[in-house]
Amino acid sequence: MFTFLKLIAGFRVTFSAMFKKPVTEGYPEKPGPVAPRYHGRHQLNRWPDGLEKCIGCELCAWACPADAIFVESADNTEAERFSPGERYGRVYQINYLRCIGCGFCIEACPTRALTMINDYEMADDNRADLIYGKDQLLAPLQPGMAAPPHPMAPGSTERDYYLLDNIAAANREAR
């Protein structure tokens, strides 16, 4: 009889839980909140006129302790200009199979071309898809930006880009 009462007491917890509203996450349909300072996926940023901030210096690759970043630089020409400097990152890859999310690459970047955004959905069933290329890492073009390659904003120099002196305004006036 005593064991039967213990059994009923145990089932009482089970039965009370059966009729409560389930506490589940509706994750695929409704993503959960992300902390404002959460660092997830990397992003290559652009200047206000659409040129890329990456100058192909490879400092991010040198700073990465996991050797997850590969950068191959090329020279800009006046006919094809991708960044305001003399070079740009022609090939830029981050291997998320190796990345440990330490942020050393962000600290090493002299032009703040590389940042980490709140995107955390990077899972995939194919290992090759976890090596993100430049096209996946570049920030999308905003209104008022032109897709590179294009010349620098009229009347501006490389120094103006790094000081952000009226680049967006000069670019809008040129159109």
UniProtKB/Swiss-Prot annotation:
GO terms for cellular component: plasma membrane. It comes from the Bacteria. [4Fe-4S] cluster 1 binds at residues 54, 57, 60, 109. Residues 44-74, 90-119 form the 4Fe-4S ferredoxin-type domain. It is a peripheral membrane protein. [4Fe-4S] cluster 2 binds at residues 64, 99, 102, 105. Pfam families: Fer4_7. This is NADH-quinone oxidoreductase subunit I 1. It comes from Mycolicibacterium paratuberculosis (strain ATCC BAA-968 / K-10). The lineage of its organism: Bacteria, Bacillati, Actinomycetota, Actinomycetes, Mycobacteriales.
